[in-house]
């Protein structure tokens, strides 16, 4: 039994394994550890991390390792609050299963040592601050204060997470054009380093695609021009580096028109490779013109697209600010067809979440609720509930950060200089 395992581990390690593990295996969720300065000591407090805050008294026994001047001190945090000596950093290499929130003053200290940390910690710090802003534990401008420290970043995994988070921010704040300039500045060094020419290093290949796509979707003119140049050559000669295809196709759709849509669609129809078809479906969801988006949505339900690929295509359009409402309307208008095709499998819940979880207004919250009261797919109840919760999280995220982020962006345009 489990208790026997804990007892054996406890006997060998001489550590209170059973006492600690019971709080992790017999209750749901995971903790947030907040750190504040109190007099001449640090105060650590724990609470359950929730994107939608509610009263919750859950406590964990958390093994805490704090680092200061190359020394490590260990604590077992079983109470709501404990005090420790001052330290530089907590949760080295992200070995602890908890999020960390530093107060504003301590966060500045962490920012000053980021470049000395390993990739796991650089990722953990960045991911924590963004997650905390999503859950309204901190302001989103703290995330933007942090990011210039990553200007010389080279790790693929770190950049992938930064890119994903910035993409989500741009989706929720589409009118803040200063974000594009911020992203271009943040990614400028890595772009100079890796450019367009392929190196057969797996991580660099992956990194290049992320960097180019992020810059292109942030309206970097030079990157978009180079993508157009390479795509035109591809149309004439069928030659394009496979490692660059998704990035180039995505940028062509984002900056393209009806002509480019026709070219991408023809490539899709003519291709016999499923991998290529997936790339093209994903990229065609990035057009911004209403008439093209509507045409592509119709194409998705045509005989040209396999049933199992519909979710990928729908998700791509729904993840496009210009396509979300159109995708939702299309889903409602064609609900019977979606239910006929996907009503008994896993695709229907995925389609519902890919669309509805991206809304961020109370109006849409009510609209989604009303629609699924009348149309209740049997296997998607959990997906509907998750989507409604996501809308509430998104609403709070936008409401709590729209004004402060806009002000921060306007007053920090020279932050990279």
Where are these regions (language model features)?
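Long, ordered, helix-rich scaffold segments
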Residues: 7, 36-38, 43-45, 52-56, ...
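Gly/Pro-rich turn-and-neighbor structural signature
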Residues: 1-49
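A short catalytic or substrate-binding loop motif that flags glycine-/basic-rich loops and adjacent residues
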Residues: 25-27, 54-59
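Extended repeat-based solenoid scaffolds, especially LRR ectodomains
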Residues: 63-65
